[in-house]
Amino acid sequence: MKKITLLLLILLLGNIVHSQEIYFLTGKNYTNYKIHYKGTGTVNALDKKGEGDSYEMGIAIPIKVQRLAFDNNLNYTVGLTLNQYNAESGDLANNYTWKSEYIGLQNALVYSFVKSNLLDLAVKGGVNVSTLLYGNQTINNSRFNLSNQKDFNGLIVSPLFGLQAKCNLSEYGYLSLGYNYSRSINLTNDSDKKLSFLTNQIVFGISFELY
């Protein structure tokens, strides 16, 4: 896992040199665990919801499209992400807690439909590819490692859609507020039990233009 993390950092930092904007995002994930078994419908005997932290650092590369009314209102972003997908549940007899942390690479296209010197409003669509960095489940006072659970580990792909508002902080700096919705798919889970993370994400960010 350390080798994967180091490789992602090298690739990301290597591209920053040639980019025009670098960004840092942090926020909250509000996640709902959806579980179903092969050949059946969704099975969630208990609501499994929770919140966790989200972090992303990356680069934004302008894409010039001649048919668009303004220059550089389409951007390609690539970033290294760290997301927590947590949940809690329980009944009269038992308490359940899941804590999981995933490291990944996120690619997205961001289109600014309102763009001025002071304000930038944009829609966003992309995909996050991640793998489990850490995870455990607690049932009452007993804790279990999730790293060997097929519904949690492996290759997780999460298509996402969102909105972003950005305003000028200085001549080359910006503050941003964003909302993203994603639903995960585990590409390597061949068991009968399937788990998806349905996540509403709120993020705050800062970005700087590089020349």
Model-identified regions with their sequence ranges:
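Sec-dependent N-terminal signal peptides
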Residues: I4-L13
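Short glycine/proline- and aromatic-enriched beta-strand/turn motifs that initiate or cap beta-hairpins
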Residues: H18-F70, E209-Y211
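Residues that define the transmembrane beta-barrel architecture of outer-membrane proteins
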Residues: Q20, E51-I59, K99-L105, L119, ...
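Gram-negative (and chloroplast) outer-membrane scaffold detector with strong preference
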Residues: K28, I61-N141, L169, N200-Q201, ...
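Predominantly the C-terminal beta-signal and adjacent terminal strand-loop region
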Residues: I35-G39, K150-D151, I156-Y211
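Generic beta-structure capping elements
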Residues: L9, G27-N29, N180
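Flexible, solvent-exposed loop segments that connect beta-strands
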Residues: Y33-G52, Q84-Y102, L133-N153, N189-L195
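Positively charged n-region of N-terminal signal peptides that target proteins for export
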Residues: M1-I4, S19-Q20
